[in-house]
Amino acid sequence: IIKEFGIQQIRIIDNGSGISNDDLVRAFLRHATSKISADYDLFHIETLGFRGEALASISSVSKVTIKSCAGEAQGKMLVLEGGKVVSEEYYAPIKGTDLSVENLFYNTPARLKYLRNPHTEQANITNIIHKFALSYPNVAFELHVDGKITFKTYGDGDVHKILSKIYNMGVARNMIEFSGSNDDYKVFGYISVPEETRASKNYINIFINGRYIKNYGIQNAIIDAYGTLLMINRYPLCVINIE
């Protein structure tokens, strides 16, 4: 959920496993993480982040309200302003997490001044939700912008349906599914037919272990694979998953 291009509010609600009451305060400590417990874990990362920086950084420049329950008898709610806890209470348990970030950069006006065009910020948020939806088709996503649902998926695993929502039905029909593997890697996804192109490389979506990346080597390899089938300065649409 975003309001006023995400500057007034960014709110994220999920029905996941939640955060325990004891861990909720720790989640906002810099470098605190529940995802690394031994050196071994550094080489077997299965999450989208692990450094313990994001929540600490966000809470230091905004007002944050978080409610979470991990199956306990009561859920816990915290309110933080400028990185400091100003309120702490319990509520009826609803499994999952509800995180609201309001008044971004309220205490650092210089940073607020140098934000990009508000419409660009909103487009960036929309774009990252699209990436998540393509990378995790079995998870349902909804994006609300100023009270209106602008994007929704159902978590049914149908990537074609997601492509049609992001682009359009015609583009989805022109995407070819592929897969291949060896002893070290598995590569699968969708690529467009040579006639379905764009003037920008931004439509080449590459994911490694579920994480969206920009890698010019892989990007150029994809373009080179099309060879002379592509017109000059035209690029394919792709969803490439590498595991």
Residue ranges and their predicted role:
Residues 1-243:
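N-terminal phosphate-binding caps/lids of nucleotide- and nucleic-acid-binding domains
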